[in-house]
């Protein structure tokens, strides 16, 4: 199915709008990390108790990514995007109105449903809508939108929450989604499904040991990162005893360092993806081990967060590149699985951080996170040695 030829300008506008949508969807997943203390205060709960909604959201996305992709595989893509945006916006209005924590969690589950469908179709849509010969650039634009969610979305969401209340943050995300939806309605042509959501490719993917090993690495390293990252805002305020404003600065630094990470990966990723990912995981181990010692000063935490941000961005980009390289004929299913597995890691990390904070001490989140990070480092070295060629990005 080819789309009627359009000007390059219109084609790029379509891809950019999708990238903005990716930014919005990822911002709403990450933004509660910066709002945990405020949400806890408004519902008279402990921060660690509120943190469970990070796990619920991530695991709903993880469990529903593949089923939703298959359920909607025959649906015309423009109509599907409109439907999932309506669900996304309505759920944000419910988040804004949430009269108790249960209602807030229900609204987040609605958002997670939309998120699960969105991420299982976005990569293939970007490729279809891209100007001729610009598929790789279209995919990197979507990745940039995703990366900017951590760089800008999360800190801006936190600033809005700090000054206008956390409800306003969710309302603003909903309004951003509404504007994006209107742009998509105007810009997108009819996009008949290309039946990309087929289970036939699943057995092939499961029979690829390099890919399965990569999925295991993903879940372990993401669990390590989110064990500490999910609770970084209350950690800065309650353990380090620093101000709410500094917590915002730290999130901005951590996200902003991701830009450096993506530049490093963009320059060296094609040839040295395995080495880069291994070095980044080693850097993550060091950052997690030093989190508590660094809490003695703002400068130490700031420096640590820069290295942490670089490491996690390189890891995320490296994993995506490798998954796409190992499953060139089943990118939709492979990426839906990757998204699901990534979210299992987010949920698991947030849950471990939650349990450590509730039953032990929030000061230990870095040390506990370093345990799976060390395991991930050993696993990465082993699998990159075993499959050195197939794990490198295929030439375009």
Swiss-Prot record:
Q: Which terms in the Gene Ontology molecular function aspect does this entry carry? A: carbohydrate transmembrane transporter activity
> What GO cellular component is one of the record's annotations?
plasma membrane
Q: Does the keyword rRNA-binding apply?
A: no
Compartment list = Cell inner membrane
Report the membrane topology from the UniProt record: Multi-pass membrane protein
Gene3D superfamilies reported for this sequence: MFS general substrate transporter like domains (1.20.1250.20)
A Pfam family of the record is MFS_1
Q: Where, by residue number, does the polypeptide cross the bilayer?
A: 15-35, 50-70, 81-101, 103-123, 136-156, 169-189, 202-222, 246-266, 275-295, 301-321, 333-353, 364-384
| Keyword DNA-binding found | no
Instruction: Keywords in alphabetical order, please.
Output: Cell inner membrane, Cell membrane, Membrane, Sugar transport, Transmembrane, Transmembrane helix, Transport
User: According to its UniProt record, which protein family does this protein belong to?
Assistant: Belongs to the major facilitator superfamily. SotB (TC 2.A.1.2) family.
Any idea what job this protein has? Involved in the efflux of sugars. The physiological role may be the reduction of the intracellular concentration of toxic sugars or sugar metabolites.
Q: What is this protein called?
A: Probable sugar efflux transporter
Q: Which organism is it from?
A: Salmonella paratyphi A (strain AKU_12601)
């Amino acid at each position: 199915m080819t789309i009627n030829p359009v000007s390059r300008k219109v084609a790029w506008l379509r891809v950019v709008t999708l990238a903005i949508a990716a930014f919005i969807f990822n911002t709403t997943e990450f933004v509660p990390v910066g709002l945990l203390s405020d949400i806890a205060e408004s519902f008279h709960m402990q921060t660690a108790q509120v943190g469970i909604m990070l796990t619920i959201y991530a695991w709903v996305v993880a469990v529903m990514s593949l089923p939703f992709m298959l359920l909607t595989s025959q649906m015309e893509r423009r109509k599907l995007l409109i439907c999932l945006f309506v669900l996304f916006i309505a759920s944000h209005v419910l988040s804004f109105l949430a009269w108790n924590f249960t209602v807030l969690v229900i609204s987040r589950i609605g958002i997670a449903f939309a998120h699960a469908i969105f991420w299982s179709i976005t990569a293939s849509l970007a490729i279809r809508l891209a100007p001729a010969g610009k598929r790789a650039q279209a995919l990197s634009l979507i990745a940039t939108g995703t990366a900017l969610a951590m760089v800008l979305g999360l800190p801006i969401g936190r600033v809005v929450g700090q000054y206008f209340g956390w409800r306003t943050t969710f309302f603003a995300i909903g309004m951003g989604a509404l504007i994006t939806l209107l742009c998509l309605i105007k810009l997108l042509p009819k996009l008949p499904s290309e039946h990309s959501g087929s289970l036939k490719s699943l057995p092939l993917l499961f029979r690829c040991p390099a890919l399965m090993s990569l999925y295991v690495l993903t879940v372990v390293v993401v669990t390590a990162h989110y064990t500490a990252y999910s609770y970084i805002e209350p950690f800065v305020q309650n353990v380090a005893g620093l101000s709410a404003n500094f917590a915002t600065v730290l999130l901005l630094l951590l996200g902003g360092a991701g830009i450096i990470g993506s530049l490093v990966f963009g320059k060296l990723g094609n040839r040295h993806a395995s080495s880069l990912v291994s070095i980044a995981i080693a850097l993550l181990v060091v950052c997690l081990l030093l989190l508590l010692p660094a809490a003695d000063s703002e400068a130490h935490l700031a420096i640590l967060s820069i290295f942490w941000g670089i490491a996690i961005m390189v890891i995320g980009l490296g994993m995506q590149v490798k998954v796409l390289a190992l499953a060139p004929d089943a990118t939709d299913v492979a990426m839906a699985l990757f998204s699901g597995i990534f979210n299992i890691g987010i949920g698991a990390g947030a849950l471990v951080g939650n349990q450590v904070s509730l039953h032990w001490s929030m000061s230990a989140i870095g040390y506990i996170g370093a345990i799976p990070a060390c395991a991930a480092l050993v696993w990465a070295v082993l699998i990159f040695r075993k499959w050195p060629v197939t794990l490198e990005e295929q030439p375009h």
